[in-house]
Amino acid sequence: MKTSKIVLFFLLHILFFYSLPFALNTVSSKRIEGEALVRWKKTLSSHDFLDSWALNNTMNLRSWTGIVCNSEGSISEINLSLSLNGTLDKLDFASFSNLTRLNLNNNNFYGFIPYQISDLKNLTYLDLSYNHFTGEIPESLFTNLGKLEYLTLTGNYFQGTLQSILTKLTRLKGIVLAQNNFSGSIPDIFGSMPNLEILGLTSFQGNIPASIGKLRNLRLLDLTINSPLNFTIPPELGLCTNLTYLALSGNSLTGSLPLSMTNLTKLSTLAITDSNLSGQILSCFITSWTQLTALRILKNSFTGEIPSEIGLLINLTTLILNGNRFSGYIPQEIGSLKNLWFLDLSVNLFSGKIPPTIWNLTEVIIMDISSNHLTGTISPEAGDLMSLRLLEVLDIGNNDISGSFPFWMESLQKLRVLVLKSNRFNGTIPISKVKLSFSNLRIIDISYNEFTGVLPNEFLENFKAMMNENDNDIEASYADVLSTISLKGFEYDLRTFRRHYTSIDLSNNKFQGDIPISIGKIKGLHTLHLANNNFTGHIPSLENLTSLESLDLRSNQLVGEIPWQLTKLTSLSFLNLSYNHLVGRIPERGQLLTFPNSSYIGNPELCGLPLTTMCGNGEPQPKLPVSTTRRDDDLNSLDGFTWQVVLVGYGCGMLFGLVVGYLIFKYEKPEWFIAFVYQIYRIKNGRRWR
C-alpha cells in the first residue's frame, strides 16, 4: 500500500513537470497574440469597436471582438468587418502561428499587402475584399501559404496580370478577384486546377478558355468580359456539370447559348446580363434547368417566344428577362410559378393580353411588365385579389392597355409603387368607397393616359403613407425599390434620393376643374406633376409641402397670382408654371429667384424677373403670345416626368432575403456572386460600393 502511494506520488510529479512547459507556453502564446493585436489597434484611426482588446484581458482572448480561439485558447480566426481605417503594416503576422482564417472584408484598409503575411503558415482562408488595397499581390502569398484554400480580394485596387496570379494559385478551391485593376486574359491553365470550386473574375480581356470544361468540381462561376473582340460561350462549359451558380456578363459575348448547357442540370442561379447574346431560349434548356430558383437574362438580344415549359420551374423565385426582344404572348404557365416573388418582363416585344393567371402569383412582390405591346384591359375579374396580398410594386406602363382606372387595386394594402403611364386608360376617377384606399402608396404615375373629369379630393386624401414628411418607417422590402426619373432631359437615379421618396404624376391627361386642395395635406410629397391637363382656378396652398422638390403645373388653365407661399418651399429645385393664365408679379424671394425664364413663359399677365415684362413703372415689354404651335413645341421639348421602375440589387431574391432593391435586380453586378460565396462560407458581408 505504501509502495503504491509512492508510485502515484512519483507519477503525479512527472505529469506536473511534463505539463508545466506546455501550460507556460500557452500562457505565453496568448500574451504574444494579445500584445500584437493591441499594438496594431493603436495604429488604426477608428477602433471604437475594439475596446475589448486590452492588455489586462489577454488570458480571455475569446471575449475580444472578432476573435475566435481554438481549444487551447490560441487565436484561430480574426473576423473584422467594422469599417476600420489603417494599414496592415504594423500587424505582426508571425505572432499568430495557429491562425487559419483572416477575414478583413468591408473596412477601409489601404496600402500594400505586407510580404510578412506569408508567416501565417496555417492560413486556409483569406478575405481582404472591399477595402482600398493597392499594388501587386506579393509573391510570398503564393509561394509560402501552402495551406491556403480560399482567397477573396474583390473590390480593391490590386494590379498585375491574371497570368502571373492564377498560375501560382492552382491548389486553391476558391478564387474571387473581381472589381480590381488586374489586366490580361485568363490563362489556359484550368487543367491544372482540378480542385477549384469557386471562380470569380471581372474585367479581363480575351475569351473564355475551352479548358474551363476541365473544372469538373466547379460550383460557382462569375465572369465579366471586357474585350475589343467578340467571343462566344465555349461549348466546353457544359462539362462543368456541378455548376449551381453561373453569371456571365460583358458586351464581348455574342452568339447563342450552346446546347451543351443543357447538361448543367444542377443550376440554381443563371444570370447573363449586358451582353450581345442572341437566339432563342429553347424548351430543352428550360426542361434541363428544373432546379433554377433565379433566372436573370437581361439586356441581351434574345428573340422568340418564352417556352410554355417555363411553368415547370416550380422552384423559381426570380424571373427577370427585361431588355431583350422576346415576342409573342406572355405564357399563361407563368401563373404556375407559385414561389415567384420577382417578375420582370419589361422592355421586350410581348403582345396580346395580360394572361389572367399572372394575377394568381400568391408570393409576387414586384411585377414589371412595362414597355411592351400589351393590350386589353385589367379588371377585378382578372384574378383573386387575395392572391396579390404581398404585391408592393406594379409597373405596366408603356403598353397599349385600356379601360377605366383599376380601383380594384385599392385593397392591396402593401402596394407602394403603381405605374400605369403611357397607356390608354380613360374615364373619370370616382370617389372610392373603400376606407383605406391605396393607403400605403408612395409612388403613383398615371401620366400620358386619357383620364378625364374632376379629380376628387378624396382620391388624394387616401395617400396616408405620403402624409408624414418624416416617415422613415419603411420595410426593407421597399427601402431599395428604385426608379429612374427622366425630368426635362436629365436622368436622375433614385439611389441618390431619400429612401422614403414619394411622387404623384398625373400629367398629360384631360383632368379639369380645380386642383384638389387636399394636395396641400401631403406633407411628405417630393414630386408633384400635373402638367398638360385642363385644371382651372387658382394654385392651391402648398406651403405645408416642405419636402417638395419638383413642381410641374405647366400647360393648364390656372389663373390668379403665384402664391407667395411657394417661396417657403426651400427644397424646391424644379418649377414650371408656364403656359397658364397667371397674373401679377413673380414673388422675388426664396427658391423662386433661382428659376429661369422658361418656368414662367406663356403667362401674358405675369411680370417681373426673370421675365422681360417689367412691373409697376417699368417700361413694358412685348408680351409673348400663347400660340398653339409654341405650346406644342414646348410639350415636345419638355417631356415631363417619366418613370421606369427597374431592378437594383440584392442577392438572388428570396435566396438571400427580402427585397434589397429593384435596380440591383435589373442590372447584373459581381456582388451577386460575392454574396453567394459569403452565404456558403458564412462570411458576414455588408455591401459597400465604390
Residue ranges and their predicted role:
Residues 1-690:
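Plant-biased, solvent-exposed loop and capping regions
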